[in-house]
Swiss-Prot record:
Pfam families: SSB_1. Residues 1-97 form the SSB domain. Belongs to the PriB family. Involved in the restart of stalled replication forks, which reloads the replicative helicase on sites other than the origin of replication; the PriA-PriB pathway is the major replication restart pathway. During primosome assembly it facilitates complex formation between PriA and DnaT on DNA; stabilizes PriA on DNA. Stimulates the DNA unwinding activity of PriA helicase. Homodimer. Interacts with PriA and DnaT. Component of the replication restart primosome. Primosome assembly occurs via a 'hand-off' mechanism. PriA binds to replication forks, subsequently PriB then DnaT bind; DnaT then displaces ssDNA to generate the helicase loading substrate. It comes from Bordetella pertussis (strain Tohama I / ATCC BAA-589 / NCTC 13251). This is Replication restart protein PriB. GO terms for biological process: DNA replication, synthesis of primer. GO terms for molecular function: single-stranded DNA binding. One of its GO terms (cellular component) is primosome complex. HAMAP family: PriB (MF_00720). InterPro entries: NA-bd_OB-fold, Primosome_PriB/ssb, Prisomal_replication_PriB. Disulfide bonds: none annotated.
Length: 107
């Protein structure tokens, strides 16, 4: 299984581009902050992760303001072939109510 669900804030939102197959593609940099319990002890988690949205979801996210809080779901894949770095491939994204974004999104 390769599924990741995360609450995150949009730190960067790139310009719309298209894949060689002609699909709209949007690169984002997301930041996540949370506190979890690991081995019975609280642990603060702060991370940034590169993400990409393709197709209709890319079009929906293209005007997302920086700082928008979202719930995202997708899968992890290598950033490039044979790379040890990973990228989150978004399959769903929902703006969190009260965030800087306008309407909730569902991909």
């Amino acid at each position: 299984m390769n599924t990741l669900e995360l609450s995150a804030r949009v730190l960067e939102c790139g310009a719309m581009r298209h894949t060689p197959a002609g699909l709209p593609a949007l690169e984002l940099l997301l930041v996540h902050e949370s506190e979890v319990v690991e081995a019975g002890h609280p642990r603060r988690v702060e991370l940034t992760i590169s993400a990409v949205a393709l197709g209709d979801l890319a079009l929906l996210l293209a005007d997302t303001p920086l700082g928008t809080e979202m719930q995202v779901q997708g899968f992890l894949a290598p950033a490039r072939k044979d790379s040890v770095k990973v990228k989150l491939h978004l399959q769903q994204a929902r703006r969190i109510a009260g965030s800087m974004g306008r309407d909730p999104l569902v991909g």
